[in-house]
From Swiss-Prot:
It holds the Pfam family Fapy_DNA_glyco. The gene is mutM. Monomer. This is Formamidopyrimidine-DNA glycosylase. Signal peptide: none annotated. HAMAP family: Fapy_DNA_glycosyl (MF_00103). One of its GO terms (molecular function) is damaged DNA binding. Keywords: DNA damage, DNA repair, DNA-binding, Glycosidase, Hydrolase, Lyase, Metal-binding, Multifunctional enzyme, Zinc, Zinc-finger. It comes from the Bacteria. DNA binds at H93, R112, R155. Binds 1 zinc ion per subunit. It catalyses: Hydrolysis of DNA containing ring-opened 7-methylguanine residues, releasing 2,6-diamino-4-hydroxy-5-(N-methyl)formamidopyrimidine; 2'-deoxyribonucleotide-(2'-deoxyribose 5'-phosphate)-2'-deoxyribonucleotide-DNA = a 3'-end 2'-deoxyribonucleotide-(2,3-dehydro-2,3-deoxyribose 5'-phosphate)-DNA + a 5'-end 5'-phospho-2'-deoxyribonucleoside-DNA + H(+). Its cofactor is Zn(2+).
């Protein structure tokens, strides 16, 4: 699933292309992708809306439109939102095509069909269920070391599932959670309440640094991710543990292990990330 750095990379590529263009029409090839409003209203409402800005909240892309509307897009597991020349044939698994006033198109494709799109009044955006439940943005000022320390002290959960909880920290997923825990030398099964102040400080810095590094390298492409221009990311070349089972830990040389934690595959180093 695209995580914060990948969604931010898509946002930045589309922000460079879309503002000022109008959506002249939309072709919906898989109606279940559109969650609200009803399909005919969706098509009618979005027609001739001008694109003002491309934003992001957690893993949601937010395309602000004229007349007080916002197009919210969640890519889920394999979704893609790509700016295409009008003559480009749609890629396989393309489900929605937005026609633009410059003759180009915006294609939403999703092999696994889990991605979703909403068109809502901008002033009602915070009431959208998935968005209103989101936690703090980890690259913004509200996410401080003290905030993390306070929250971990009151949450009786294992650290890896907690980092994946979008109501706690918005945008973290399996890749960057595994990498952050490895960099901070914390086992994914540790209870959050047992982390020392020094470990919390390392984890805080690891989360911030890794997300920024991911953005600077245009995201991580393990299998499916491409940005708004159709280009793969580069950060997979720098991963230390994720998807590296059996390979040597870059820090100590022990073999990277894999196990299920909270129902999710977790990659870690048994030596650097010992259970305490």
């Amino acid at each position: 699933m695209p995580e914060l750095p990948e969604v931010e990379t898509v946002r930045r590529t589309l922000q460079a292309k879309l503002p000022g263009l109008k959506i002249t029409g939309v072709e919906v090839l898989l109606p279940k992708v559109i969650r609200s409003p009803e399909l005919s209203e969706f098509k009618e409402t979005i027609a001739d809306k001008k694109i003002l800005k491309v934003g992001r909240r957690g893993k949601y892309l937010l395309i602000n439109l004229s007349e007080g509307y916002t197009l919210a897009v969640h890519l889920r597991m394999t979704g893609r939102l790509v700016y295409c020349a009008g003559q480009d044939p749609p890629a396989r698994h393309t489900h929605v095509i937005f026609n633009l006033s410059n003759g180009c198109q915006l294609h939403f494709a999703d092999m696994r069909q889990f991605g979703r799109i909403w068109l809502v009044p901008t002033d009602a955006l915070d009431g959208l269920k998935g968005i209103k439940e989101l936690g703090v943005e980890p690259l913004e000022e509200l996410f401080t070391r003290e905030f993390l320390k306070k929250e971990l002290r009151r949450r009786h959960a294992r650290i890896k599932p907690l980092l994946l909880d979008q109501t706690f920290i918005a945008g973290l997923g399996n890749i960057y959670a595994d990498e952050a825990l490895h960099r901070a030398r914390i086992n994914p099964e540790r209870l959050a309440t047992t982390l020392t102040p020094r470990e919390i400080a390392r984890l805080y810095r690891a989360i911030r640094d890794l997300l920024q590094e991911g953005i600077e390298n245009r995201g991580t492409t393990v299998r499916d991710f491409i940005d708004g221009n159709g280009q793969a990311g580069n950060y997979q070349e720098f991963l230390q543990v994720y998807n590296r089972e059996g390979k040597p830990c870059p820090r100590c040389g022990d073999k990277i292990a894999k196990k299920k934690v909270g129902g999710r595959s977790s990659y870690y180093c048994p030596t650097c990330q010992k259970v305490k």
